[in-house]
């Protein structure tokens, strides 16, 4: 499923294709690209739930927390998000790329993945996907995009 999400995100973002595509056509295109039906449906469901979170119709997060409070991860979250991932989320909060609400959206979407393995690079892409469509998060998205692609360029040199 994560491969389908990555494919969709890279294809639509970098080519600036209109995001409102007929789901049947999109499913056909993804099938022709070699993805399995189950992965396609899971990815589309994942994106639908992300859209619900972004427009406020999804699960509401308790955001009345003290700004100095620390996020305590559940055992399941800690197993899926290693210390590098959790540290990176904290770093992004500290530099105000993520706020309490967007952090919780990221964690929710990470935990909804069916990935057997998940690392910091995967987390960065999930963060980009979450920030991409949230009104008012354009600067945060740009900062995150700079962090992701700046690091990729450094690996090329």
Swiss-Prot record:
Domain of life of the organism encoding this protein: Bacteria
Q: Which family does it belong to?
A: Belongs to the Smg family.
Matching entries from PANTHER family are given as: PROTEIN SMG
Q: What is this protein called?
A: Protein Smg
